[in-house]
Structure formats: C-alpha cells, structure tokens
C-alpha cells in the first residue's frame, strides 16, 4: 500500500550535530523522497553507541558537520525508490551501516562481510545516486552518518543497507541488533570461531564486551575472564557469562603477565573491546603461544598504531580484526532477530535506560560517564 507521503518531502524532528562537542540541536529537518535504490524509513527507536559519541567528539577523521548521527535503530519503511524490490512500505526493518549488495567482489568472495558498493558515498556523508544528502534544514544540506542517520524521525538509506525483519519483533529491543550486540557475538562466532572448552579473555565490559562474553558462553568456553578497571561491572558481567574478573589496577605486573600466570601460559582467545592500542598489545600477548588468537573489536582513535615484538607472531599467535562481528547484514540480521525471538540470545538485558529523542544530550552524558550500557530513545519529542 502506497504511503500518503510517498514522493513528498517530509518535515520531521531530528537531533542535528552542528559542531563537535556541542550539544545536539532538535531541529525541524526536511527529508527528501528516496531516489532509485533508496529507502525512506520511519525510525521508531534508536540506541546510542560509543561510535556516535566518538564522531561527535571530533576525534573521527571521517566526521563531517553538520550531520545527523545514529546507526543502531529500528523502524518501518515509509516509501521506496525506483527499482527497490527487497522491501516495501510497511516492512519492519533495521538500518545497517554495514551494507550487503551481494554483487561486489567483497560480497561474492565468501571471505568477508565487508561490502564495497556504497562506501564511497557513506564515507563522505551522502547518497550514492547523486553524491548529495537527503537531509536539509532551511535549504542547507545536513550530512548523513554511516549511511544510516537514525537520530531523525525519518531517514533515507541505500536499499543494500536495510534488513527486513520479523514484524512481531519488538522494535524497542531489536534496534540493538544494528551494531553492538552482533559485533560482540560475531567476533566470537565468526571471526575467532571459539571452540567448546576454550579459555577466553575479554578486555572492556561495556555492551560489546558483554556480548563477547555471551557469545563465548554460548560457544562452550570453559573460562571467560573479564578485564576492566571498574569492579562494579563484575556483578553485571556474570549474568552474561563472565566467570572471573581481573582489575589491572589491583596488580603490579602488566596485565598480560597476570593473565598468563592465571591460565598456565595464556588464553586461547582474547578480545579487545575498548579501542586502546596498548590494551590491544596486552590482549595479543596474553594469548597462548602456538595457537592463541586475539581479535581487535574496539576502534582506536585516528592516527594511532599497534605494535608488538614480531616474536609474538612468529611463535604462532594470530592477530585479527572484526567489523560488525563478521555478520552479513541483510542476510544475518534477520537471523539474529529470530534467535532473539526464540530467546537464544540476550538483548533486553543490555538496555539500562529508556528516554525520548528530546533527551538525547542527557543520554550522551550517561553514555560518556559510563552510567549505562545501552540507552534506547523513542523518537517522540
């Protein structure tokens, strides 16, 4: 059924980031109709992620202002552009910052979940068709963010960047399956491929780290060691599968040596979920020689570099990275939603706060202060 607003410009509320580190401004934003290969989505719920905060802080070299941030959300298709066949108005969807065109060399390789089709546009805050934005305020364009821009009541995304999901799934919960939870689960299941009986170390017990722990427990890990400098996180972490807790501040030795001593030579798998290059090195060096695998999940600040002694790799350790946990977005996000509906993965447990779009600056403050895992915003003002 056609939407009454199909083909028209929609004026709606959005949280606009005009400058780094300045409060977001709730504005009346004009959202243009979708062009060929595009989908306009009514966003109902969006969560805040540290990646949004990172770009807002001004530390992201690809950060463009003014922009509409947000990339972890769920909504309903309002209208589609010419040639779009995989979704239609009324479909429940999750926008996906990691596209999946199924046609480019990356998608066809079977070796990665990366996709090359629209990256040249999403990386510079525009849409592929005309390299322009679909957002404006009083005639002035506002940049897109990560190809999603979910801090707006309506957004326009590429059709290769939207996953159709079970309409019975609660959108205020499954919006989390757009980023953090799949990133952690997939780092374990797809990137590291943790086996039953493994010893696992998780550095950083935020949402992504807890999802790593959950994934490790589901994979049958015998020990899941959580590493964080906040002791209060351990009680929460136990609910996600962490069996032991280590606070680096409570030890004189380097944390990698502490873990080597605790595990008879090192862990089988380690995951860095912070974005700190010195911790990335520690995560590698706490893994066992011969087969230890360390996965970089956290995103370091621009310009930072990782280092270790080559001997660490010569003796059999493997250093890997992961984006969106290796999940193919359009194919596997619906599968993750179905797993949630069958109670096979946690989602609700990551949500510590619920607020409205009007409260977005307070929500950012909560995230920055470490006072929440995930805050879900309803899009009303």
Swiss-Prot record:
This is Alcohol dehydrogenase class-3. Pfam families: ADH_N, ADH_zinc_N. An alcohol binds at residues 51, 71. It catalyses: a primary alcohol + NAD(+) = an aldehyde + NADH + H(+); a secondary alcohol + NAD(+) = a ketone + NADH + H(+); S-(hydroxymethyl)glutathione + NADP(+) = S-formylglutathione + NADPH + H(+); S-(hydroxymethyl)glutathione + NAD(+) = S-formylglutathione + NADH + H(+). Transmembrane segments: none annotated. It is found in: Cytoplasm. One of its GO terms (molecular function) is S-(hydroxymethyl)glutathione dehydrogenase (NAD+) activity. Expressed at low levels in the leaves. The gene is FDH. Its EC number is 1.1.1.1, 1.1.1.-, 1.1.1.284. GO terms for cellular component: cytosol. Binds 2 Zn(2+) ions per subunit. Homodimer. One of its GO terms (biological process) is formaldehyde catabolic process. Keywords: Cytoplasm, Metal-binding, NAD, Oxidoreductase, Zinc. NAD(+) binds at residues 50, 204-209, 228, 233, 274, 297-299, 322-324, 374. It comes from Zea mays. NCBIfam families: adh_III_F_hyde. Its cofactor is Zn(2+). Zn(2+) 1 binds at residues 49, 71-72, 179.
């Amino acid at each position: 059924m056609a939407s009454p607003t199909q083909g028209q410009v929609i004026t709606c509320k959005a949280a606009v980031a005009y400058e780094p580190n300045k409060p977001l401004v709730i504005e009346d934003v004009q959202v243009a109709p979708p062009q060929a290969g595009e989908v306009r989505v009514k966003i109902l719920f969006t969560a805040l992620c540290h990646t949004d905060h990172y770009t807002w802080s001004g530390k992201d070299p690809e950060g463009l202002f003014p922009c509409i941030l947000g990339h972890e959300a769920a909504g309903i298709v309002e209208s589609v552009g010419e040639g779009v066949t995989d979704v239609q108005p009324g479909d429940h969807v999750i926008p996906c910052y990691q596209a999946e065109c199924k046609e480019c060399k990356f998608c066809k390789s079977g070796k990665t979940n990366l996709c090359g089709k629209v990256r040249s546009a999403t990386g510079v805050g525009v849409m592929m068709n005309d390299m322009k934005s679909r957002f404006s305020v009083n005639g002035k364009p506002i940049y897109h963010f990560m190809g999603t821009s979910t801090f707006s009541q309506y957004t326009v995304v590429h059709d290769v960047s939207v996953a159709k999901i079970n309409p019975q799934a609660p959108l205020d919960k499954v919006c989390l399956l757009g980023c953090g939870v799949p990133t952690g689960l997939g780092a374990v299941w797809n990137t590291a491929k943790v086996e039953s009986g493994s010893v696992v170390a998780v550095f950083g017990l935020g949402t992504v780290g807890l999802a790593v722990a959950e994934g490790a427990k589901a994979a049958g890990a015998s020990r899941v060691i959580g590493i964080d400098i906040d002791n209060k996180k351990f009680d929460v972490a136990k609910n996600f599968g962490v069996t032991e807790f280590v606070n680096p501040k409570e030890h004189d030795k380097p944390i990698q040596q502490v873990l080597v001593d605790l595990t008879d030579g090192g862990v089988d798998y380690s995951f860095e979920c912070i974005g700190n290059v010195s911790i990335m090195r520690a995560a590698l060096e706490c893994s066992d020689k011969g087969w230890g695998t360390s996965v970089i999940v956290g995103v370091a600040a621009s310009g930072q570099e990782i280092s270790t002694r080559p001997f660490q790799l010569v003796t059999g350790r493997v250093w890997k990275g992961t984006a969106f946990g290796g999940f193919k977005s359009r194919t596997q996000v619906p599968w993750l939603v179905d797993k949630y509906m069958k109670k096979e993965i946690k989602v609700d447990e990551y949500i510590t706060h619920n607020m409205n779009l009007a409260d977005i600056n307070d929500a950012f403050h909560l995230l920055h202060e470490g006072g929440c895992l995930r805050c879900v915003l309803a899009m009303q003002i």
